[in-house]
A protein has these predicted regions:
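Extended, low-polarity segments enriched in aliphatic/aromatic residues
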Residues: 2-172
Length: 172
């Protein structure tokens, strides 16, 4: 009840939870945090990922092409969407900061870095006995972030190919 950002969930005393479909914005927080698996989102991962890519395209269409720079701080990587109201132990060590003029390339590079990282003890990954690198979000949450990135590429928002250039800190 407290996790819903639009107050669409209420509990009638002694009865079941009630979700007001008119208020619900389909964010999925309730389904993700329900420890009993009692709540399911009516929207599947493919439709959600396509919607994310299409929404991104709509927003980016309001900017002059070539005038957007993307910066990903791959730090304190949380197991859930950053829209969730709580923080948890990061899934992996901080991976750094990525900068690109291609949204698909930077997201692909970010996911590739995370796929190579070993999950941290005491994280949600460890809670699920995930101790090896690879497909971390898919294994932790059952959601594949690469779906949205793939759809973004299909929509022409960028290319998944990239060159990662590491900039080392200058010694004094």
């Amino acid at each position: 009840e407290k996790v819903c950002p639009v107050d669409a969930i209420t509990l009638k005393k002694g009865e079941a939870w009630i979700v007001d479909a008119k208020k619900c914005d389909q964010c999925g927080r309730c389904a993700r945090v329900c420890t009993f698996g009692a709540l399911e989102m009516p929207i599947g991962p493919n439709l959600f990922s396509r919607g994310m890519a299409e929404s991104t395209k709509a927003v980016l269409s309001t900017f002059t092409p070539g005038k957007v720079l993307y910066v990903n701080f791959v730090m304190e990587v949380q197991p859930e969407c950053d829209c969730m109201p709580t923080a948890d132990t990061p899934l992996v060590q901080d991976q750094g900061i990525l900068i690109s003029d291609d949204i698909v390339a930077i997201e692909t590079a970010t996911l590739d870095l995370l796929d190579k990282a070993t999950p941290l003890p005491q994280s949600k990954a460890a809670d699920k006995d995930i101790t090896t690198p690879g497909d971390l979000f898919l294994r932790v949450n059952g959601q594949d972030p690469r779906l949205a990135v793939g759809y973004a590429e299909e929509l022409g928002l960028g290319k998944s190919s990239y060159e990662l250039v590491e900039i080392k800190k200058k010694r004094k």
